[in-house]
């Protein structure tokens, strides 16, 4: 018997999306970003489906170690870098690359004793102003890294875009120009493009692209949908009806009596709530998919349940599946209705939701 709620992960969708991104950036290698438990899709699930990726990007050392323990041999890169000097021997032992973005990391690399050098990607702050060495610091930092015997040569170079998900915002051009001017003539790989860069800014593609959300079939751009680019949603979030009730006009439903029926109808109660990661602030009218049609959420989302208006003539039954988002109901649409982004929806599912390959 299938569990519910469950996140059904499509291996064929993941593979399709990788192929689409390869075609989009045919001269680049692909570093598939699988941080945050593979964007909620299951870290090892995703990595095992994407065996043809050239490498994987992660946020935490623990994620990289999990991939190595799971048999993944591809290049791994810690996108936030290491946090402690005691991390460095683990990078060496497990052949894990690291981003360097801060003075404190350089000091640790200069002071630690290692059995072999670490592969480093120096992050340049080209305009996002979150992580990275500034243009003013770059020459000095680069020289220190080149002089450090604990760092493998060549040093690779990277940056991150602030506004690439706004295709008409030319700040991305400004960032590309700053990065390219600063790093001109230096050896090593270059990586600039995230999902939005790969899809919308072909000049940013470089030696490696670092797609995240697009791998999961989701567009990084507000108002857009991954299917417009040939991407396929990789997650179907599914639960089921646990009650179907006749409901009279002018009667409320749920906590706070937030919603009142305008006419006689049939309500369905769905076994999913904010305890599973479905947002409590989903407003009235947020769609779910039941038996081939959209129906609206009514009343407040509670911890374990939400209620939908099935309609006066509904024939839906207890036990029928309910799709919260996925191939028939894009997560981008649900996120826009709720007032958030698809990234947040897919990554905030709680452990009560079974994640399984479909």
UniProtKB/Swiss-Prot annotation:
Which Enzyme Commission numbers does its entry carry?
5.1.1.1
A single GO BP term for this record reads:
D-alanine biosynthetic process
Q: Which pathway does the protein contribute to? A: Amino-acid biosynthesis; D-alanine biosynthesis; D-alanine from L-alanine: step 1/1
Transmembrane region positions?
none
Annotated CDD domains = PLPDE_III_AR_proteobact
Q: Which residues form the active site?
A: 35, 255
Name any cofactors this protein relies on.
Answer: pyridoxal 5'-phosphate
Q: What does this protein do?
A: Catalyzes the interconversion of L-alanine and D-alanine. May also act on other amino acids.
Q: What's the protein called, per UniProt?
A: Alanine racemase
Q: Which gene encodes it?
A: alr
